[in-house]
């Protein structure tokens, strides 16, 4: 190792009790990814791979898959890369990827792909899914809605996932984000919105004072 004969791993293993040294401070510093499964009547189980931006909780990419292979993970990451434009030469840094230790995430094929893209891989401690808490909560919220219905074709399920992702990203206010939407935070609209809210609140309070004094 002293003579650089042993290379450092492209991934980092974090313990369940560990926290990141510094919370993310901007979009595309850390991406969380995970699979969940959904059933299509008479078709069987399908697997949803999602990628969530840790800072904003914005869903960057998702794919409904027939399995949980490294290739399907790569395809979803590729969609996130294209969406975010991180290959642009002007982008100076790459996000880290946080996942669990499923077979698709520890595969050689994914390791080589991430190395080529300059994306460092962080994996949670085995059997502690709370490490990927944000993506886990997102999938749980999504399934609480989607599982109210039955789906009879993969296309029907995909359409409902697309509708939910749009709702979650653009219309669902999140308490942990100062009651902003993930899109507000991801696209940097948060400060302006919060300032306007304060102004409206101040005007409302002043009107109430005037009314009470009259």
Model-found features: residue ranges?
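Basic, flexible linker segments flanking DNA-binding modules
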Residues: 1-30, 128, 187-192
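Mobile genetic element proteins and their domesticated derivatives, centered on retroelements
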Residues: 34, 51, 57, 77, ...
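RNase H-like polynucleotidyl transferase catalytic core
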Residues: 10, 94-101, 115-134, 148-154
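Hydrophobic (often cysteine-bearing) scaffold residues that line and stabilize catalytic clefts
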Residues: 28, 48, 69, 73, ...
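Acidic/histidine-rich, metal-coordinating catalytic segments
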Residues: 77, 88-107, 125-127, 178-183
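Active-site beta-loop-alpha junctions of metal-dependent nucleic acid enzymes
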Residues: 44, 63-89
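C-terminal domain-tail junction helix/linker
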Residues: 93, 108, 115-119, 140-214
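An active-site-proximal beta-strand-loop segment
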Residues: 29-60, 66-68
